[in-house]
Amino acid sequence: MRHRKSGRQLNRNSSHRQAMFRNMASSLVSHEIIKTTLPKAKELRRVVEPLITLAKVDSVANRRLAFARTRNIETVAKLFNELGPRFAQRAGGYTRILKCGFRTGDNAPMAYIELVDRPEVAAEEATAE
């Protein structure tokens, strides 16, 4: 029985799930918007939001903890140099999930997940895609 077990399995084993969310978190931090399935977007929010909260206090220990969770130096640098100061006054709710229809082929519900206060230039690039 799976009583009180949180998180979605997404038809993957635990190491695959961990690697997938590591990669998706790095992509979201670098591009500030990504398109994925709705359940993955909802789970990714649980990974990315604590990372941004961690980046609000720039210390060596927090940088090492963020690196342990993402395994990407560029992601850690952007988190602490750009996103931490940008979201310093916001107490959570750093991401937004926008539904965008269904995928051709398997009819999976798709969604954009984006950072809330991203620059408008990036918004124009996303609509061009």
Swiss-Prot record:
GO annotation, biological process: translation
- What is the protein name stated in its UniProt record? Large ribosomal subunit protein bL17
Keyword match Transcription regulation: no
Family designation: Belongs to the bacterial ribosomal protein bL17 family.
Keyword line: Ribonucleoprotein, Ribosomal protein
Native species of this protein?
Pasteurella multocida (strain Pm70)
List the Gene3D superfamilies: Ribosomal protein L17
| GO MF annotations, alphabetized | structural constituent of ribosome
InterPro entries cross-referenced by the UniProt entry: Ribosomal_bL17 (IPR000456), Ribosomal_bL17_CS (IPR047859), Ribosomal_bL17_sf (IPR036373)
Any one GO cellular component localisation term in the record: cytosolic large ribosomal subunit
> Where is the organism placed in the taxonomic lineage, from the top?
Bacteria, Pseudomonadati, Pseudomonadota, Gammaproteobacteria, Pasteurellales
Question: What is known about its subunit structure?
Answer: Part of the 50S ribosomal subunit. Contacts protein L32.
Record carries keyword Ribosomal protein = yes
- Name the cystine pairs: none
